[in-house]
């Protein structure tokens, strides 16, 4: 299937490959985009379109998209979102605090973050994911004349997940009610006893230890455990191992994100596009089971669009959101001589950039790493290694890098 734009750049109904080849051969159209393949007409034509519904399966790690008519699916995509932003923000915060710790005479800055006081402010990690949702919807509107959007969002009762029998005022009476802080609660919960040696070390000094690092696990009580000073130091020195029974509790990061983005995404989408509707996960699941469809993000999106019986496209587009630019000038480690290694790579290496789409020995892949000598680590978007040190002389540039890398994939066989 080939997507078509009119002479003014507005989307029309897609056509078959043979029709597109004929138009290109007769110089009645030009290539507008290679992935997904799109042509633009060079003559004035009637702008006849059909009703197309876009189903959006919103998520915290993946987005499913499917544009359908009643008879046929016209577009299907699975978008992988970035999940490294929280770690990067934590690393940046750690570096910033380390720098300021060397200047103790400087007046501390801790209460002048005015952005968080503004109405509608979102954390950078959440904001970036929501912006990606808007971008992929906008990109499809540039390819197809979408007339209706249906979005599946989800709301999670985290307190109900923790305690199925909770009701009424118990929602305001959480597990930390009556305690000054999290540390006091964790010590009380663990009966002021080391959870590693159970008090055998006779060490009276107790520490609250993060099971997973604070950077990735957070400060929630289910990520904290009581350890004595002896076990705590021994664990960090590598001489003590925690019992296998000590595990981090259930994480609700994804559920929290969906609760934040639910109304924010839907309400703003209604301001941009005219016909936007909301559906829910239980409706999608019921539709998928009734039509005996496998579970996948783009298949859920087809069910969300209201046309589960539409003829499948036969393939789908896998997209991955990549980092656009690393603004860190130096590495953190100090080299011999008190110097810091530069963190900025060359803008171009032999005419190629990071995440450029290239062809190598008949295979389409992406540049994942580069060397100034002109050798590249090339892979598929799923991380499959094609060659760890391919010469630039053997590479053919297909597309320059974009914030959303895209590759076409065949549908998996139905079992």
Describe these PLM feature segments:
Residues 15-47, 175:
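Charged, flexible boundary elements
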Residues 56-58, 380-415:
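Glycine- and charge-enriched low-complexity intrinsically disordered segments
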Residues 356-357, 363-379:
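Short beta-strand-centered aromatic/proline hotspots
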Residues 47, 68-177, 243-351, 397-414:
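Substrate-contacting helices/loops that form the catalytic groove of nucleic-acid
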Residues 195-226, 237-242:
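Histidine-centered nuclease catalytic patch
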Residues 45-47, 178, 182-190, 218-222, ...:
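Short, flexible, mixed-charge glycine/proline-rich loop motifs
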Residues 50-69:
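Gly/Thr-rich phosphate-binding beta-strand-loop-beta motif of the actin/hexokinase/Hsp70
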């Amino acid at each position: 299937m080939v997507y078509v734009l009119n002479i003014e750049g507005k989307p029309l109904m897609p056509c078959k490959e043979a029709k597109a080849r004929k138009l290109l051969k007769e110089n009645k159209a030009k290539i507008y985009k290679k992935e997904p393949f799109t042509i633009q007409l060079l003559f004035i034509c009637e702008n006849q379109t059909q009703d197309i519904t876009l189903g959006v399966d919103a998520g915290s790690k993946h987005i499913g998209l499917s544009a359908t008519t009643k008879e046929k699916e016209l577009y299907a995509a699975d978008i992988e979102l970035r999940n490294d932003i929280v770690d990067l923000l934590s690393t940046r915060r750690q570096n910033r605090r380390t720098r300021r710790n060397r200047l103790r005479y400087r007046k501390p800055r801790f209460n002048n973050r005015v952005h968080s006081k503004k109405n509608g402010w979102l954390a950078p990690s959440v904001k970036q994911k929501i912006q990606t949702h808007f971008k992929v919807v906008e990109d499809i509107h540039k390819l197809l004349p979408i007339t209706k959007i249906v979005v599946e969002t989800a709301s999670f009762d985290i307190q109900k997940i923790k305690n199925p029998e909770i009701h009424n005022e118990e929602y305001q009476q959480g597990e930390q009610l009556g305690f000054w802080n999290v540390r006091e609660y964790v010590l009380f919960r663990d009966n002021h006893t080391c959870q590693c040696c159970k008090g055998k070390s006779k060490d009276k000094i107790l520490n609250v230890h993060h099971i997973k690092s604070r950077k990735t696990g957070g400060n929630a009580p289910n990520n904290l455990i009581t350890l004595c000073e002896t076990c705590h130091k021994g664990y960090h020195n590598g001489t003590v191992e925690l019992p296998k029974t000590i595990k981090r509790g259930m994480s609700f990061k994804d559920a929290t994100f969906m609760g934040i983005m639910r109304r924010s995404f839907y309400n703003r989408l209604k301001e941009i596009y005219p016909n936007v509707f909301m559906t829910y996960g239980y409706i999608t699941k019921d539709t998928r089971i009734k039509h005996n469809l496998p579970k996948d993000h783009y298949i859920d999106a087809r069910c969300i669009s209201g046309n589960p019986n539409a003829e499948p496209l036969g393939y789908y587009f896998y997209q991955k959101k990549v980092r656009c630019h690393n603004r860190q000038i130096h590495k953190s480690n100090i080299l011999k001589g008190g110097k810091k290694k530069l963190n900025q790579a060359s803008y171009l290496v032999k005419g190629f950039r990071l995440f450029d789409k290239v062809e190598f020995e008949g295979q389409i892949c992406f540049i994942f790493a580069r060397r100034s000598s002109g050798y590249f680590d090339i892979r598929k978007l799923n991380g499959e290694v094609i060659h760890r040190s391919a010469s630039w002389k053997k590479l053919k540039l297909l597309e320059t890098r974009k914030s959303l890398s895209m590759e076409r994939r065949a549908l998996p066989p139905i079992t």
